[in-house]
Amino acid sequence: MLNKSEMGWVDFSSEDRDRVRDVIKQLSEPGTLDELGIGALRDGFADLMFPGFSTIQTRAKYLITIPRIIRDYLALKPAQQRRQSLQQYLEQQENLLAKALTLQHLNEGVTGIIGSTMKDGESVARLPSSVYWVALRTWGIIDTQASLNQFLRSVKPAESSLGSKLPDEADDTDGVSADSRIHLDRYDPQWIEGVHITLSESEAVFLNHKLQNGPINSLPAQLELSGLLKEVLDEDLTGFAQLAGWVAATPGLAQRTRDTVKMAHSFSELIYGAHLRFNIVVARNNQREDLLDQYELLWCDWHKVPQAGPEQVSQWLAATNISLRGRTGTFLMEWSEHIANSVSVVVLDALVEKQALGNKKERSILKKRLPDNYRWIGMSRLDFRWAQVRTILRDIQEGLPC
């Protein structure tokens, strides 16, 4: 009998594998366990507000360095390309970049350098190109609908640096080259010498322009187009709830964007109550009277505030075009109905417990005895990637001319 589970990959695309890796990573981090199965709706709202961004992105600089590395490869002579594929070159240069940035900012307390903790002889565990590829496509920095692997395979080493075509471009009559699909502020073959994690003025202006011309109803595009980016960054909006309050009070943004933020915040608040009851159930099962008292007080405060009803839940699902797995959609409807009708906590706890067990089955936290010092389990109020987006937008804003 096997004592250890193993995972194998079906080779669909790098995005498919990255999505699974993200899930595995999240399961090892506090506050990300999706015990109630609402992650798809959370991600649906995040994709509307912050398309292309993810929770594992760190700094804006990688939106520049990845296309620079690809452009460097495309500038090589065909003979040099035949000796090394774009995939090999990209991996090599991204590892060199990690070392260069780490040395450049040594002992400066700089955060967000991918690969800064790797030791001699090691490689970056998660290359920036895989982390930022969707963002590069979404914001028009690299013009392609191909996955990262498809794009890398499409640039054949034996071809001219100006002659490589992508799978989705095969029928283009004008023969668009891979080189012309890479957009940058300027070509700088010496860019890696003295590279910094911060953006130059030219790079910041370029990314600022890309955000302005990105998905029109996304929050980054609206903040750029309305001239409100500096204002939102100057505010102490560290959490999504604070951001939602600011957006509600700011008429300069498109109504569709404001509506999306409002719906996302309402969803976060409604489902926070369910996660609160879930933690009360867990605390009761584990005889944690200290946590039980604490969470019951939080519940009393939460329950005083009016929450979204079933009609709003239907609007959320329509707006995000999300189909929730299993009976999660029914659970959301029933939860909102019960809250609107002030149903007893006995019924609420039974509903939450049923959903958790139906979602996770034998893997549910409810089936496990937890350590004596455990704290909050699973999700709390949702952030929708705002923390990561805020850092990247701040990088861009700080690089712009005064």
Go through the PLM ranges and name each one.
Residues 1-402:
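Non-catalytic recognition/regulatory regions in large multidomain proteins
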